[in-house]
């Protein structure tokens, strides 16, 4: 662990777990580790939350599934995701919550003010999917279906975008479709800014499609 001046603060290690991912809280006061192990032939994951003043974990959460990715979502919580499971974990160590996803996770994204979007669907059918919107308190606020392939997702404080081939679908947080925009080529990524502008990125360029109305 290093500070902003690139000075080593401390080193943490484990002989029993593989470190799958790390995350830093938005306020810069804590870090989280996703640790992966096995017990009886099944995956066991732990999420540790540490402060910068000590290498001793302050909080620990245990999950009987694979957790391979952590992403901070505002000041209150982080997303902890695996192949077919997802949780929110409070940065203050007070709780974790199972998001009860159905199927494999397609994509997810967080927004700095605390909103998150997560998409999942059937492993053998990429045309049947669902989208979960998680609020600033780390609890789901809506869940709606999306009947087309999902190549990416983005979110801001008011809207969520879903990238599907060359189309960017814009929804509000309740799952109401607001608009559909088309890119000249299939983008690799799409983001929605705080003001509602939608930017797509492919191998050679960035494109501003439109401002969300």
Residue ranges and their predicted role:
Residues 39-49, 84-90, 125-132, 167-171, ...:
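Structural motif
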Residues 1-67:
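Long, acidic/polar, low-complexity amphipathic helices and coiled-coil-like
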Residues 3-7, 51-54, 90-94, 134-137, ...:
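Short loop/turn segments that connect beta-strands within beta-propeller blades
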Residues 135, 164-197, 201-205:
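C-terminal closing repeat unit and adjoining cap/tail of repeat-based domains
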Residues 16-26, 62-75, 101-113, 145-158, ...:
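Repeated scaffold domains used in trafficking and secretory/extracellular systems
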Residues 74-152:
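Eukaryotic tandem repeat interaction scaffolds
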Residues 7-13, 55-61, 94-100, 137-144, ...:
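A short beta-strand motif characteristic of beta-propeller blades
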Residues 28-41, 71-82, 112-125, 152-164, ...:
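Short beta-strand elements that form the blades of beta-propeller/WD-repeat-like
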């Amino acid at each position: 662990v290093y500070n902003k001046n690139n000075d080593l603060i401390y080193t943490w290690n484990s002989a029993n777990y593989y470190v799958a991912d790390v995350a830093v809280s938005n306020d810069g006061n804590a870090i989280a580790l996703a640790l992966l192990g096995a017990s009886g032939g099944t995956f066991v994951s732990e999420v540790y939350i540490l402060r910068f003043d000590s290498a001793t974990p302050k909080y620990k959460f245990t999950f009987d599934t694979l957790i391979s990715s952590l992403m901070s979502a505002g000041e209150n919580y982080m997303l902890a995701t695996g192949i077919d499971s997802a949780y929110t974990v409070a940065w203050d160590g007070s709780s974790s919550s199972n998001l009860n996803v159905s199927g494999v996770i397609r994509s997810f994204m967080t927004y700095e003010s605390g909103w998150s979007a997560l998409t999942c669907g059937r492993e053998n059918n990429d045309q049947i999917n669902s989208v979960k919107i998680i609020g600033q308190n780390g609890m789901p606020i809506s869940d709606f279906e999306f009947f087309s392939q999902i190549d990416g997702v983005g979110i801001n404080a008011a809207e969520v975008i879903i990238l599907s081939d060359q189309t960017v679908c814009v929804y509000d947080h309740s799952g109401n479709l607001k608009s559909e925009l088309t890119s000249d080529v299939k983008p690799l990524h799409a983001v929605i800014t705080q003001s509602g502008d939608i930017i797509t990125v492919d191998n050679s360029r960035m494109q501003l499609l439109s401002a969300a109305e």
